[in-house]
């Protein structure tokens, strides 16, 4: 079996209505390079907490997208060319993956392009491309 197998993709929308405004990016954001920097974080659950299912994570994500509604929007440009976030409530891209490996079997995870390719799909990597989804969340079971 592959180290990690992606089994599905879903768009998770906010759990309730959100504002539909436009948010300008800060001057510091405007100087940033326009590409995603893949980052993966592993956390061991507390012994007293049951491991959440993909459905639990999707529900939690939909709830958190209400107060953080900009993350359910899309990058765009204003008529004068300034980069901004259009709060569209389109949702965040959620990828679900499975692996037979335990966290310990992954070994010491070192951030690299090769390791990120094991866990992060290639599409959705260009936040300025309006035809691609720009936010990825993963659930591993």
Labelled PLM ranges:
Residues 1-141:
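Non-catalytic N-terminal regions of enzymes
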């Amino acid at each position: 079996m592959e180290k990690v197998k992606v089994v599905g993709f879903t768009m998770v929308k906010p759990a309730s209505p959100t504002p539909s405004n436009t948010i300008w990016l800060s001057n510091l954001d405007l100087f940033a390079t326009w590409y995603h920097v893949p980052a993966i974080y592993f956390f061991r659950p507390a012994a007293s907490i049951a491991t959440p299912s993909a459905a639990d994570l999707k529900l939690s994500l939909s709830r958190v997208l209400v107060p953080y509604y900009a993350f359910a929007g899309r990058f765009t440009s204003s008529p004068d060319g300034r980069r901004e976030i259009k709060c569209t409530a389109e949702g965040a891209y959620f990828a679900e993956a499975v692996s037979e490996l335990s966290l310990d079997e992954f070994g010491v995870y070192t951030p690299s392009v090769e390791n990120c390719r094991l866990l992060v799909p290639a599409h959705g990597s260009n936040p300025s491309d309006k035809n691609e989804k720009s936010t990825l969340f993963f659930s591993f079971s």
